[in-house]
């Protein structure tokens, strides 16, 4: 018989929705939660997200657990019998597993409440435009604001049954990068009468990498990646405009500031050199995931005692997660959950091993009961 929460994961996998459009997802979650024993539950909606408070038997504090619920604009290529029914969208970052795990933990405590209050945060828009900071600033969250908060993220590179975590920095600071170039278009045969923005943007892509190699301490780390470039409309017309979309990743806010300062200085030089206008457009910024050392060491000790084969020391990663906003104000941690997939996060063929779901539920239930 299929595990109940694996079945839930498969249901959610079929209805992926992007940030703040998670209407079917929210409805599915609310329908499930409404059928749980409600003696100890209070439920609030926030935009397309949900907050659920499980009242403790003798509460002295509130412990938070956060899961993200949104998907990515990726066309699925897994060929699974339960693949996405929403063309162009896919749960390619494992948020379907995250939700099913959270529901499993919530189901346990709805019937057997812990001593302290538990707050379950089903957060929208992690992939963008960013839901953590707005939900933290909401009246709904503020009323039930937890004293500690935890979260997880699936990790294709680890085996099922493995949990990777470390004190301190786990995920990087991230900043979305959107740049437009505006020059002067013209006939392809007369480049001297135009200002070619394909040339300007292409040169900028290469030059910005010198920020990493020549402005960042070699013992530090930073990444600038351009994932999309678009310029012009037809092959025989010099492009009047060009656009670069990318991301910046750093291990500290200070390094992020250096990168942005140099990018803007570089852009001023480009305007002079290529006789164009260079403009930066706002995107999402994610704060680093910085695990509280005391909370993390407590969890590591718990794993070593209860799941001695599971703990794996993690390394800091350049991935980004807006859970960092929670940890910037509330002590807690995030960990990697092994799902053993040959394809990476954000890949159209990502296919996590579902056995990780009941394992994670068991670990989290036992850990929260030990608090």
UniProtKB/Swiss-Prot annotation:
- Look up keyword ATP-binding and say if it applies: no
Which Pfam family name is an example for this entry? Peptidase_M20
Signal sequence annotation: none
Q: Could you mention a single GO BP entry for this protein?
A: lysine biosynthetic process via diaminopimelate
Pathway named in the protein's UniProt entry: Amino-acid biosynthesis; L-lysine biosynthesis via DAP pathway; LL-2,6-diaminopimelate from (S)-tetrahydrodipicolinate (acetylase route): step 3/3
What is known about what this protein does?
Catalyzes the conversion of N-acetyl-diaminopimelate to diaminopimelate and acetate.
Protein name, as recorded: N-acetyldiaminopimelate deacetylase
Traced from the root, the source organism's taxonomic lineage reads: Bacteria, Bacillati, Bacillota, Bacilli, Bacillales
